[in-house]
Amino acid sequence: NANSDVMHGGFQDNGNFITFSPNPTSHWNMPFNGDGCFAGIADNEEDFYLTIQRGVMYKMKLDTNAERLAFNRMDPISADSTNYMFINPMVMDDNADIIYWAEGHKFWRNNDLANIQYNNSHAKSDLGWHLFSDSLPSSSMKISVIETSVNPANVVYLGTQNKYIYRI
């Protein structure tokens, strides 16, 4: 939501922080500690997606003080976490509540975020995750960045540690 006052981000070595205020000097709150990484906010501005080191991802329901009301771990159980980067790439699509996820040279998508129920579990889950069958051409390549296009929609860019960029 371009008109929203909500800001959410991962601060490496310093957790994940959120503010609900447009005031640049307002206090930011930390709902989850760890090496804060990538973050996303659902269109409803009630569901927050955050990652910490080694590919751990959570969906959280927060109050306006960024206190956890409910959570659910959601990184895919079928992914081999030994292929993750320390700060593992994740992005939320700019046009829809869809998350894209990297597993080394493999590429994942979850377009069923609304159906991930809160159960206050720290267990990984495959709910809604789909592995692209035609990920990168070589297993020696690693996806290091993922970005989506606003216009045109439905375009995803992958960058690799080998200095290649792919458009999907």
Regions found by a protein language model. Name each.
Residues N1-I168:
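Beta-propeller blade termini and top-face loops
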